[in-house]
A protein has these predicted regions:
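Charged catalytic and DNA/RNA-contacting regions of genome-maintenance
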Residues: 89-94, 112-220
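Conserved "right-hand" nucleotidyltransferase catalytic core of DNA-directed polymerases
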Residues: 1-108, 130, 172, 194-383
């Protein structure tokens, strides 16, 4: 007799071979099921990345002009901004190799803050940042230019691994450099107050900006190596500005027409509701799967197809098979159609209409594994 079981001969799946194959075939669920990881095309840094820089607070117009002149001469600068644009950290290389960080804060700056931002975000200064589209939308909301962005580390991280799921600075830095950064709550309008210590928080802000620069230096050549640079520079990166402008402009909605459409739906729902009650022999909660199941398979004794732990299944597939058995079924399906229209397209949209009669959805480039753009707050793809 054989002295081993089938389990003794099981071998671990070759992740390096299966991952690219499953990605090509779009077997994303199998990638998750078997815990497959992408091949280590980008080796982790052997030495910890030094994120310390020489920092200077810029408070005067004269000093700002000096730095802006240096920024224009630099090959690129790396910057992060607070969500309300009240603070900006800019890293750049001065001379041959000296890393310098300049910090700008509205509360400390003696000059025209908007003039400074207009200069900083013009095309004269080539900028690397993280989540560029979000920053560009904020700039547009403040009447500022959105030019000169040459790299977005979040977008590059997504192209290099669309299955990672997390593309914040800390997650990307941990994945590629095996170093842990402080919680990414430093980008707060209120002078980083949640960290408790302003000096500590400002240090974290500098560290994150330096981390973005380190990611840029790693990601840019990797995009070339994987022949993703054309897709990145000709499609994905320019798309950031397009989406930012779309979010800023919004989509005009006629609230009165939407309300009228909603009223039509309510009339249809009320009419169908009464017909369903008549067929069922009395009122019940049509939206309750349990009560609906009790009516259909208990009271009306229709043939039950599926039963779950909580009761009979009343999903669309089950109901469609029951259409020949009773006229109530087609009315329930029609009721659900109008209910969906009312809840998704009337109730779901009316609360998102702004004072200017526009809906401003958020378009995301890094949410899906297939590369398509997703929409949220509200999800316009449902329409």
């Amino acid at each position: 007799p054989l002295e081993f079981s089938p389990q003794d001969n099981l071998r671990k799946a070759p992740s390096d071979a299966l991952y690219p194959l499953f990605m090509k075939l779009e077997f994303t669920k199998l990638i998750d099921k078997y815990g497959l990881k992408p091949p280590a095309d980008i080796p982790a840094a052997e030495e910890p990345v030094d994120l310390t820089v020489t920092a200077e607070a810029v408070t005067t117009v004269e000093k700002a002009k000096e730095y802006l002149s240096l920024f224009r001469k630099a090959e690129h600068v790396t910057l992060l901004a607070l969500p309300d644009l009240s603070g900006v950290i800019v890293d750049f290389v001065a001379g041959e190799s000296t890393a310098v960080s300049a910090e700008f804060y509205f509360s400390r700056y003696e000059g025209d803050w908007n003039a400074l931002l207009r200069a900083l975000f013009s095309d004269d200064i080539k900028k690397v940042s993280h989540n560029v589209k979000d920053l560009q939308r904020t700039l547009l909301e403040n009447g500022l230019p959105i030019e000169g962005f040459i790299f977005d580390t979040a977008l590059a991280g997504y192209l290099l691994d669309a299955t990672a799921g997390k593309y914040d600075i800390a997650s990307l830095f941990a994945a590629y450099f095996h170093q842990t950064l402080a919680e990414p709550k430093h980008l707060d309008p209120d002078a980083f107050s949640m960290l408790g210590d302003t000096a500590e928080a400002e240090t974290a802000f500098h560290v994150y900006t330096s981390a973005v620069d380190a990611l840029y230096e790693t990601f840019a050549p990797e995009l070339e190596k994987r022949e993703l640079h054309e897709l990145y520079y000709e499609v994905e990166l320019p798309l950031c500005a397009v989406l930012a402008r779309m979010e800023h402009a919004g989509m005009r909605v006629d609230a009165n027409a939407l309300a009228a459409f909603g009223s039509e739906m309510e009339v249809q729902l009320k009419t169908l509701e009464q017909h369903i009650y008549e067929e069922a022999g009395g009122p019940f909660n049509i939206n309750s799967p349990k009560q609906l199941g009790d009516v259909l398979f208990g009271k009306l004794e229709l043939p039950a197809k599926k039963k779950t732990k909580s009761g009979y299944s009343t999903n669309a597939e089950v109901l469609e098979e029951l259409i020949p058995y009773h006229p109530i079924i087609s009315k329930i399906l029609e009721y659900r159609k109008y209910k969906k229209l009312s809840s998704t397209y009337v109730e779901g949209l009316k609360d998102t209409i702004g004072p200017d009669s526009r809906i401003r959805s958020v378009f995301r480039q890094t949410d899906t594994r297939t590369g398509r753009i997703s929409s949220a707050e509200p999800n316009m793809q449902n329409i």
